[in-house]
């Protein structure tokens, strides 16, 4: 009952735009050392929050920021109450922890992935399992939040870039820089919505000010839809000197990929991933625009966004 009353009072204050100095502003952050988490920590501190972040490795404290060594699998001693809990790491791990933890926080914001939709009908069993775990984690998180009177929101990024730590566009940039060329199969023109890490961190803060986001999951794509090949062209154009983009027939590309697999390389590029290059993987971001003013930037990459 106490948690439910706290959640209601918090939502009323946030909806009214009240940010009184005596209003507690403590955040607990998981995944704060990751590419999204680093930007989120900076945003919270700039906004005057006191933050406790969790990390497996020891980290130095900073003004307004303390680090707690641990992870989501160990025993939890509540250092709350917190005004908000953020998760920028694996959603399934966080959902299990949240179900079991006796944490007092009226607001929960967790990052998931659009893979919950993209991979649910994949030909690859491992990818279908990823989608299943994400779907079940979202449901578990929302149910646990409702049971304790908290307001939970899930944010589903598309193709993330901007910190030089992503597994797709940064990998493309680095491979192309080393070789001077990047090869794509003909027909790799499925639409994409690359999204900058800063826009994701900003979104996590924005939802706190909008109680209507409680109980909802939002797709967070970038501000522009473009073909896969055009996306790669822009990545290459941002590099110095710009590597060349080479389009080859799809059968030739598949043969080269099979040889790479045979020597233990490019394992992440399976048949399903290759097929998705031709498929439109775009999502409706209008609900996020409407509910909390989401305004992502168009895709204009620069070299530093890939850590180069």
Predicted regions and their residues:
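N-terminal Rossmann-fold cofactor-binding loop
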Residues: 54-58
């Amino acid at each position: 009952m106490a948690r439910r009353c706290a959640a209601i009072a918090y939502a009323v204050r946030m909806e009214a735009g009240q940010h009184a100095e005596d209003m507690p502003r403590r955040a607990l952050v998981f995944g704060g050392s990751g590419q999204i988490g680093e930007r989120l920590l900076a945003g919270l501190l700039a906004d005057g929050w006191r933050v406790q972040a969790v990390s497996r490795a020891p980290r130095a404290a900073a003004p307004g920021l303390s680090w707690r060594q641990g992870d989501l699998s160990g025993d939890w001693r509540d250092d709350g109450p917190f005004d908000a809990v953020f998760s920028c790491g694996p959603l399934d791990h966080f959902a299990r922890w949240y179900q079991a933890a006796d944490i007092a926080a009226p607001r929960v914001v967790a990052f998931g992935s659009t893979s919950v939709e993209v991979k649910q009908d994949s030909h690859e069993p491992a990818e279908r399992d990823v989608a299943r775990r994400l779907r079940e984690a979202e449901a578990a998180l929302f149910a646990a939040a409702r049971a304790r009177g908290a307001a939970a929101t899930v944010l589903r990024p598309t193709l993330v870039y901007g910190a030089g730590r992503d597994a797709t566009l940064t990998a493309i940039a680095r491979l192309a820089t080393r070789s001077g060329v990047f090869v794509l199969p003909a027909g790799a023109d499925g639409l994409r919505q690359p999204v900058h890490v800063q826009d994701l961190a900003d979104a996590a803060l924005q939802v706190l000010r909008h109680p209507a986001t409680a109980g909802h999951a939002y797709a967070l794509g970038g501000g522009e839809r473009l073909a896969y090949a055009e996306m790669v062209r822009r990545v290459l154009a941002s590099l110095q000197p710009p590597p060349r983009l080479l389009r080859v027939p799809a059968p030739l590309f598949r043969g080269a990929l099979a040889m790479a697999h045979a020597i233990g390389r490019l394992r992440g590029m399976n048949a399903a991933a290759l097929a998705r290059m031709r498929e439109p993987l775009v999502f409706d971001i209008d609900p996020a625009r409407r509910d909390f003013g989401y305004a992502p930037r168009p895709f204009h990459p620069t070299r530093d966004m890939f850590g180069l």
